[in-house]
Curated annotation (Swiss-Prot):
Similarity annotation: Belongs to the complex I subunit 2 family.
Native source species: Desulfitobacterium hafniense (strain DSM 10664 / DCB-2)
Keywords, alphabetical: Cell membrane, Membrane, NAD, Quinone, Translocase, Transmembrane, Transmembrane helix, Transport
A Pfam family the protein falls into: Proton_antipo_M
Protein name: NADH-quinone oxidoreductase subunit N
Enzyme kind, highest EC tier: translocase
């Protein structure tokens, strides 16, 4: 049943008003008085997050504008994720943003508009709606990546991201145009019904082009080459937001598109083969390329590439759901298990990664460096920062009893239950290999000689953000039930 009520768009409307309103405030306030942008943004995000949580549990599911936009718990879960990510980034940037004297007023509004674009991607029921959300998110990141006006690396990263991002968007848009040419519609449900059970060459080409476009956004190999340079050159807080929320938005759109593909068995089979190959090479190359890195932001870039490979394993479980009868598994159950694993892991990935980047931001601000060697003796210079970074990278490695272990358990068990044990084995082996380069950071922090390096003071909002990320990472590893139930509810909303 289609309905159009503005109340269903409340979260998106709030974010749009806040983003544009903060731009206006930044124009009105004199440059020396723009410190007030931080508390305004912080309280605005807290209020919006509270509403998004309420909407998730009590808002219900509906489609409106002829299915162009979906108000369901799947989208609601991602709205919470994007707001949590934005909130943690804002908490870690109060002092960092203060040094941007000329551009301080634009930082927070751009962050909110990027989050708005992500929400549009997560809720899109139409390929063009999804593309509009993607472009809103991407254009704001073009600006934010190049936000260091006097840093050549930041400017270079911004130009590279602009050129490569535009190319990937063009590929994605061409894939959408092929689908429109085949079906006469861009509305996902209509497209799914129009494609039928068989696929021709054009259908397969459209699928590959769409997956290539998504692959760029989530840093899948071989569409990952942009990530190391952009992660290294961008301001640390923007790298954090790009590595977490932007990646999650790409997965949200990919999952909705994959549900569309499953109606066409030929497309589903082609997509399954492609994703199996991409997942394997992404996990392997991402982890192996992290070993020689000397810059921590480049290392985290390759870590993020590997993490994308793990998450794709959950999407593979969704793909198998279209033909799992051969394994004696209920397709709906297989579908929900795969999506649940993806959603759970993305949320804990946000906390672990942003905890790590909160430390990276403060070390970069205090020392002016993001080289791993400059983390020597950090445990003595800033015990809290060292503890947060240690727990964050161990969670990313999947070490129990941290949340990352539970997340990988959900992802790998979803495909094991459906017979694809080999891809889970690759994921497990690569997770164990990743422990080496993660522990190399821990080793230099606790055993390295930090003599002559400055203190790394952590206080105020940044301290709270670090502690909160660390606590959530521990608690969700010991007691994952509440988040797992939310992920299950969100996944189930896609099959209602």
């Amino acid at each position: 049943m289609m309905s159009f009520e503005l109340s269903l768009l409340s979260t998106e409307i709030i974010m749009a008003v806040l983003g544009l309103g903060l731009f206006a405030v930044g124009l009105i306030l004199p440059r020396g008085s723009r410190q007030g942008m931080f508390p305004l943004t912080l309280f605005a995000l807290l209020g919006t997050l509270a509403y998004a949580v309420y909407d998730f549990f009590y808002g219900g599911n509906a489609a409106f504008l002829q299915g162009m936009y979906m108000h369901d718990q799947f989208a609601g879960f991602f709205k919470i994720l994007f707001l949590v990510a934005a909130l943690l980034v804002v908490l870690s940037t109060k002092n960092y943003v203060a040094k941007f004297q000329a551009y301080r007023g634009e930082f927070y509004p751009l962050l909110l508009l990027a989050a708005l674009g992500m929400m549009l991607m997560a809720g899109a029921g139409d390929l063009l709606t999804m593309y509009v959300g993607l472009e809103l998110m991407t254009i704001t990141f073009y600006i934010l990546v190049a936000y260091h006006p006097n840093d050549p690396k930041s400017s270079e990263a911004g130009i590279k991201y602009l050129v490569l991002g535009a190319a990937s968007s063009a590929v994605l848009l061409y894939g959408i145009s092929l689908i429109y040419g085949l079906t006469g519609s861009t509305q996902m449900f209509t497209v799914a019904m129009s494609l039928g059970a068989e696929a021709n060459t054009v259908t397969i080409l459209a699928t590959v082009m769409m997956l290539a476009g998504f692959g760029f956004k989530i840093s899948l190999v071989p569409f990952h080459m942009w990530a190391p340079d952009i992660y290294e050159g961008a301001p640390a807080p923007i790298t954090a937001f790009l590595a977490t929320a932007s990646k999650a938005a790409g997965f949200a759109a990919l999952v909705r598109f994959y549900v569309l593909m499953m109606y066409n068995h030929s497309m589903a089979e082609a997509g399954l083969i492609l994703l199996l190959v991409l997942a394997a090479i992404t996990m392997i190359i991402g982890n192996l390329m992290a070993f020689p890195q000397k810059n921590i932001q480049r290392l985290m870039a390759y870590s993020g590439i590997a993490q994308a490979g793990y998450i794709i394993v959950g999407v593979i479980a969704v793909s198998i759901a279209s033909s799992v009868s051969q394994w004696g598994v209920d397709p709906v159950s297989a579908f929900v298990d795969g999506i649940k694993g993806v959603l759970f892991y993305l949320m804990i990935y946000v906390f672990a990664n942003l905890g790590a980047f909160a430390v990276i931001t403060h070390v970069a601000q205090s020392q002016g460096s993001t080289e791993i060697k400059d983390y020597a003796g950090l445990a003595k210079r800033s015990p809290l920062a060292a503890a947060v970074l240690t727990l964050s990278v161990l969670s990313l490695a999947g070490i129990p009893p941290l949340a990352g272990f539970v997340g990988k358990f959900y992802l790998f068990s979803a495909v094991i239950n459906q017979g694809h044990v080999w891809i889970a084995v690759i994921g497990f082996v690569m997770s164990m290999i990743s422990v080496y380069y993660y522990l190399s950071i821990v080793k230099i922090m606790y055993l390295g000689d930090g003599e002559g390096l400055p203190e790394v003071p952590v206080h105020g909002a940044a301290k709270f953000g670090m502690i909160f990320s660390m606590i959530v990472t521990i608690v969700l590893g010991i007691y994952p039930t509440p988040l797992a139930q939310m992920a299950l509810t969100a996944a189930s909303s896609l099959v209602k």
